[in-house]
Amino acid sequence: MANENLIKVKDEIYNCSVCGQCIKGPVDPLRPNPFFGDYLPERVCPMREKHRLITYSGSGMNSIARALLEGRLQVSDELVEAVQECVLCGHCVTNCGEVFNVVEGITEKRMKGHGVDTPEVVRAMKADFVKSGKEPTANVKKVAAAIEKGHNRFARSQSDRMSWVPKDMQIPKKGKLLFYVGCVATYRNSEIAQSFARVLNKAGIDFAILGEDEWCCGGPQLLNAGLVDQFEVQAKHNVEA
């Protein structure tokens, strides 16, 4: 069925009024500006800043989704590439939520105090694109291939999964609590995993790790790119390991 995933988030799509608040968020009156303050840089939509087009924004993504649902827009390679630009940072949700909190009485709580969940809309579009045969961008496919082949995003050996474990610690593979380490903490920022393991150990918590049986969660790289089937394979393995 066309737009199968978009239909599930239809309410989010039609709650977007295309007000543009998602692009830069609220004004900070304490920041210098010749008029009335400046926008918070940590709230700015990164793809909108890059392209300077409304298409590349939260409201733009919702407008695309609405057009797809209503049959006013057809999926093309250019459209897929544009939607893949969204990194799902969530700035738009935060910015939108502040607006609806202010005017909650006017909107009769239609948003229940939160903004339009545009990242969920974008995930749905990406998943529908993949189902229709439109592949993700080359960079996404490269990472997905590395995960499928070696079960981690960095194309590292699974035998290195235990390399972060401090030499003075012995961590079992069975315990009451599972510490899922993840690719980044395993291969790049091992001090994070080491520190957390020491905290658990100091607290006397009976924990375990999957070690070489741990696979990439696939969350950011697969699920956020619409590669739902491959993501589910990774998740199922980790649950059953």
Task: Go through each PLM region and give its residues.
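Ferredoxin-like iron-sulfur electron-transfer modules
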Residues: 1-21, 29-34, 39, 53, ...
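Iron-sulfur-cluster electron-transfer modules
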Residues: 10, 55-241
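Disulfide-rich extracellular modules and peptides
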Residues: 18-24, 47, 88, 98, ...
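Short regulatory "switch" loops immediately downstream of catalytic or recognition motifs
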Residues: 19-33, 95-104
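A common structural microfeature
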Residues: 42-44, 176-177
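Short amphipathic helix-turn modules centered on a small-residue break
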Residues: 43-57
